[in-house]
């Protein structure tokens, strides 16, 4: 039976960078590309970070009972939904997976697939450094959404509260102060669980 290694962390904790590097270092990993109804950001590609769909397609997939889990956020830019679908991507009898997502989606996938399949990789960064990284990233956008950045920053404090981390069974944290050190620790954790 395969494993799902699940990367999660607050906004601007370095999840996307770590995810991309792990996919390069461990090519046997398959990915589970999540879906979202939010607009594509500068530099993103459909089918890589996310499948970008509209609300109508989300509703169709819900009616077809293909949605494993979903979360909707009332953002400064409208309601954005993120979800994981049973769309044929997941073949645990053959493959191991590397996934990136939220603590809520991790918990839902753990409920769906079981503890023995899910391996949490929680990336943590001190809030001041994280806010600085988020601001730098937002400034690089063609149309920066600073209000949304602030909303996400505050929501992350609640989403990744100690209570929620405990409820999800997340015991280990990977500090992403120095990316190389963080990557080494994550690679060790992956090797122990393969």
Question: PLM features: residue spans?
Answer:
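Conserved phosphate-donor/acceptor-positioning beta-strand/loop module used by diverse small-molecule
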Residues: 96-102, 113-137
